[in-house]
């Protein structure tokens, strides 16, 4: 980790070189996703539910990852919700899970070790201080070094808009882009926008769906749904980055249409899970104070909200951040060789990685001041 823990410089020549290295990583991750897409193109067509996917299937079709467990194989998924520039939370969780060690052990002897996977639910940037040069840079490093073990899903903050030759953050405030705009040309953010557009939205693992927000609107499901390939519908992908579960049983379609961020009810969730053939949905998007919450958990299915940014005195957050009230959490999903699945949340040890001895970002103050607007 430490070789990549450096602030962007305020010196134009130095930051130019730093950003060039980061954009090379952007290109590398896009190339990984393009190769995966080419190999998996069209494989969801005609598949009504996950039961129609072959055991052991692993592919990326469009913007939907599929990982169906091999019979007799164990899996261990480390899952992180929104990180929002909290680099210490990312590093802490990956180190606690010993994820990189487990990848190496699995590569050396896959018969004796569970298959380790890292699932990232999106919202890597904004709010916290270490967005593009902390969380996203490191996520790209891990994903390009272990592409068979890392799923980088898109959050609603990974959304840039171009208007009249200028790039804007799609969510306000957009601290990551606002902080760096005075120091970098627009083409840099155009390249990040290309990366964001390339990021997948969904992972289907066994009977669990991983997504940033939630399910599409009722109207889209009724009018457009064909089979699992509809998960790649552009409007469905956008809606799944923005929706939230509610305490209601059903949210009327007219109410869902009122805003980009919209609610869905318990029965709507249950119907969508049945449509997919899934039993559970794991998502981020929503700040939950306890970091991990079983929102729905009954015979119709399980919905978990996971939030991995926060910490009362986390130096990765601005002093006024509302995320200081959050206990940042991660979770482990284990699937045994016999098919039994368990979900275990764990508190992220971010404090250890606020220590300058363990996190070079905190050895000196940033040269560029974090900017909200």
Which ranges hold each PLM region?
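Feature recognizes metal-dependent phosphohydrolase scaffolds
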Residues: 1-373
